UniProtKB/Swiss-Prot annotation:
Belongs to the UvrC family. The keyword Zinc does not apply. The gene is uvrC. It is found in: Cytoplasm. InterPro entries: DisA/LigA_HHH, GIY-YIG_endonuc, GIY-YIG_endonuc_sf, GIY-YIG_UvrC_Cho, Hlx-hairpin-Hlx_DNA-bd_motif, RuvA_2-like, UVR_dom, UVR_dom_sf. One of its GO terms (cellular component) is cytoplasm. This is UvrABC system protein C. Its main location: cytoplasm. Residues 21-100 form the GIY-YIG domain. The UvrABC repair system catalyzes the recognition and processing of DNA lesions. UvrC both incises the 5' and 3' sides of the lesion. The N-terminal half is responsible for the 3' incision and the C-terminal half is responsible for the 5' incision.
Length: 623
């Protein structure tokens, strides 16, 4: 079927009648069979019908989606809990473009522990990677300075891996000598022992510092009774450090033992801002912000969606025993049961009436209102910038979808390109694309940005569909790059697309057929928007270039190992993911990789640990 259902009422009614009034999941597809949206409902028929009954009441974004729907699929489940789990899996698998209910507020940092690695790292990040299920994220934290201070204290209290990569191949660095690192780079501590230390560190960021102190106090007493005074002193120093850490944490709430989350929102006609405050052991340790589109839904339903999306991705230990909400949630009993099952113990959902709990909700609501004001100001700024852009470029309509392209290389080596997309002035990362330049003329020692831009333009726009047609294309460069792209578009019959180039030096805007560049004032909203778009394309291209260069350098390192061909190199990289991890792996760990075996493992280990060859009886000279 290629005709949207909204244009064929008979077909639509027939299709809706086929959908049962049972719990389950529905999938909406477009003319190309792409999944546009995945949803779940207690009554599938009623929920799906609501999209087509009063379309004028839908938000502009959902109206655009409904106008593309050509087919509706459904999967019936036994209950709503199964539907929720299935919806989650389908969204993760297909990543439908209209399933962006909530957007993480990226200004809040997390602490990540990479449990997926043999020797986990601790680092601060603003992006949660959901594709690595073993890694754990703690936070978010409102004060990145305090988080860095906390992490610095933790690394002084516990001997931890201090670097992402070893400083030396054949010896430890100063951190080992002063007791800051247990010698991870040289395998002086086993992964099992190191993970025991990381488990203690994780307790700090789970709000279990008091419990950890009690555990260390018991170990200190045991060590002293066994006359192991060195270990006892180490535990004593760790306890003192943890007590110092507790003093530097955020303001305590009246009950110093309580752990709970609190959700509240503020909304206007277009959007809702949700805030989630995290209280652990009586301390306000984190805050998470979401922005949701206001589709005219009840505030309680918006809060419920935010709660579901947040806790779907949480580790059970991150779910507190009590969650406060500003409003009573429509599916209160179901959600309470779902959260309790996920955590493995009772979780209470409460819309508080008591003074102390109500005051916490009021605090969260005030913060949500402040965030709504800030978000609306940014949205107004972007809307004004887009209107100004249409004015200065003489566009027929205010542009919604902006695309930018940049090339990144070092003298022609590892040449790549980026495509970034802004929709309504904001990054739409699900539409970002990366390209490896295939042109044989672009090679180390010989760069050609014109040819690279032409290649990317042909690869992108020869496959363009009406749904992903840009309203404006920005090329990073000058007249030459613009001419190269326009020649390709003319060849494809697409030279009607609005295309401009932005030169870095003077921030001049070049338009096709106009030899005189357009110069806008430094604070012009249109210029600032184009600069943000161009800079994002540059960042994305540079990150991909560095990734490709690093992979090539890693491959060249492995090429030097005798008997290690491309296939085995691939096996190693799939298992360890980096040269640094291969370097610190033991001979037994290397041999356990399928396709490697003891003999090749020995050669790999000796390459990274040349001192072992002198100690090996196989290499000793016979006298």
């Amino acid at each position: 079927m290629t005709v949207p259902l909204i244009h064929s009422r008979d077909v639509l009614e027939s299709r809706l009648k086929e959908i049962p009034a049972e719990p389950g999941v529905y999938l909406m597809r477009d003319a190309t069979d792409q999944i546009l949206y995945v949803g779940k409902s207690k009554k599938l028929r009623s929920r799906v019908r609501s999209y087509f009954r009063f379309t004028s009441d839908l938000s502009p974004r959902i109206q655009r989606m409904v106008a593309q729907v050509c087919e509706i699929e459904f999967i019936v489940t036994d209950n709503e809990s199964e539907a929720l789990a299935l919806e989650d899996n389908l969204i993760k698998t297909h990543q439908p473009p209209y399933n962006v209910l909530l957007k993480d507020d990226k200004k809040y940092p997390y602490l990540c522990i990479t449990w997926s690695e043999p020797y986990p790292q601790l680092y601060i990040t603003r992006h949660r990677r959901l594709d690595r299920n073993q890694d754990k994220y703690y936070g978010p934290y409102t004060d990145v300075g305090l988080l860095r201070h906390t992490l610095g204290l933790v690394k002084r209290i516990f001997p931890l891996r201090q670097r992402p990569k070893p400083l030396y191949k054949d010896r430890t660095c100063l951190n080992y000598d002063i007791g800051r690192c247990p010698g991870v780079c040289q395998g002086l501590i086993s992964p099992e022992e190191y993970r025991k230390t990381l488990t203690q560190v994780a307790m700090i960021f789970q709000g279990q510092t008091d419990e950890l102190i009690r555990e260390l106090q018991e170990k200190m007493i045991q060590a002293a009774e066994q006359e192991n005074y060195e270990a006892a002193a180490r535990y004593r120093d760790q306890i003192r450090g943890l007590e110092q850490l507790g003093e530097s944490q955020k303001v305590s709430l009246p009950n110093s033992t309580v752990s709970r989350d609190a959700l509240a929102l503020a909304m206007n006609d277009s959007r809702a801002c949700i805030q989630l405050f995290q209280v652990r052991a009586g301390k306000l340790v984190g805050r998470l912000g979401f922005v949701a589109e206001n589709r005219g839904d009840d505030p309680g339903l918006i809060l419920q969606r935010a709660l579901q999306e947040h806790y779907q991705y949480c580790d059970p230990v991150e779910i507190p025993s009590e969650i406060l909400t500003q409003y009573e949630l429509p599916d209160h009993d179901f959600l309470e049961s779902w959260l309790s099952q996920k955590k493995g113990r009772k979780v209470s959902l409460v819309a508080p009436q008591r003074q102390s709990k109500a005051e916490l909700i009021e605090l969260v609501e005030r913060n949500a209102q402040l965030e709504l004001t800030r978000t609306q100001r940014l949205a107004d700024r972007d809307a004004a910038a887009l209107e100004r852009l249409a004015e200065v470029l003489d566009l027929p309509d205010v542009p919604r979808r902006l695309e930018a392209y940049d090339i990144s290389h070092i003298q022609g080596s590892d040449a790549v390109a980026s495509q970034v997309v802004f929709i309504d002035g904001l990054p739409a990362k699900q539409h970002y694309r990366r390209y490896k330049i295939r042109n044989p003329e672009v090679r180390p020692g010989h760069s050609d940005d014109f040819a690279s831009h032409a290649e990317v333009a042909r690869r992108r726009f020869s496959k363009m569909t009406p749904e992903d047609q840009p309203d404006l294309v920005l090329i990073d460069g000058g007249k030459g790059q613009l001419s190269a792209v326009m020649a390709v578009l003319a060849d494809l019959g697409l030279d009607h697309l609005p295309v401009i180039a932005l030169a870095k030096r003077e921030e001049e805007i070049f338009l096709p057929g106009n030899p005189v560049p357009l110069r806008l004032p430094a604070q012009d909203p249109a210029r600032l928007l184009l600069q943000r778009l161009r800079d994002e394309a540059h960042r994305f291209a540079l990150a991909f270039h560095r990734q490709q260069r690093k992979a090539r350098q890693h491959a060249s390192t492995l090429d030097e190992i005798p008997g290690l061909g491309k296939y085995r190199q691939k096996l190693l990289m799939e298992e360890f993911r980096s040269i640094a991890r291969i370097q610190v792996a033991s001979e037994d760990q290397l041999a356990q990789v399928p396709g490697i075996g003891p003999k090749i493992a020995r050669q790999i280990y000796r390459y990274f640990h040349p001192e072992t060859q002198a100690e090996s009886p196989e290499t000793a000279q016979v006298e």
